[in-house]
Amino acid sequence: MAMPGHLCPFGLKSLSMLKLKGYEVNDNLLETREEIDAFKKAHNVNTTPQTFIGGEHVGGYTEVKKHFGYRVLGKDDTTYTPIVAIFTSTALMALAIVLNLYDELQLQTFLMWFFATSMVVLAIQKLQNVEGFVNGFLGYDLLAQRYVPYGYAYPFAELYAGFGMMALIGTGSVLIWLVAPVGIFIGTVGAVSVIKAVYIDKRELTCACVGGESNVPLGFISLSENLIMAGMGIWMLSIWFAS
């Protein structure tokens, strides 16, 4: 479909995939609503684009992906791809910060920056769609189920704790008392909620940790996020006491 003001992205992706697989493609553009309606009627389909290989009707972009053996996520399928992408990015971000600000690479310093930046990025993910996040969060968080506004406050609390920890790493400032308890509180409540939902009640849920309408399974990843928040708060308080 190539109409004024709209160029079909699925058509472009199908075309690119076919070319990458070595096919010579005869790309027939549908440029008017009349052409689109006539094509759908002639081939008894509801959507465009449609791909034909060797005279055989393969289907739309999703069917083309399946044809070439790519995984296509169904409505109820889960994946760890979003969380792997986030943690890989925040690990590299933390590494860049440590190499730039410190004379040597120390594991403790790296982990602090990694945990703090991960909290910030995960909070940003949630803030992209707060309503969607809350809908998923209410499925398992024990405090949010009793007091719904907590669900709306959670992403902001996580962002606050993450930014606060980033600002105070290595300072030994008493201001850590304004930040660490927030991380400890929401992390502890979250960890208990995940343990109950997944490991006690044996429920199969998706995790709201990367935002609304996530297809990341609830379990170890969400538990890790909450333990990191609580642990980071305790860690920074222990450093303050020792200083």
Predicted features along the sequence, with ranges:
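Local sequence-structure signature of Cys/Sec-based thiol-disulfide redox active-site neighborhoods
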Residues: M1-L30
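Alpha-helical transmembrane segments of integral membrane proteins, especially early/N-terminal helices
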Residues: P9-F10, S14, G74-V84, P149
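Structural alpha/beta surface segment adjacent to cysteine/selenocysteine redox centers
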Residues: E24, D37-T48, F52-T62
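Thioredoxin-like thiol-disulfide oxidoreductase module
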Residues: N28-N46, Y70-K75
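Membrane-interfacial helix-loop segments of redox and metal-homeostasis proteins
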Residues: A42, V84-S243
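Non-catalytic, surface beta->alpha helical segment in thiol-disulfide oxidoreductase systems
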Residues: I53-T79
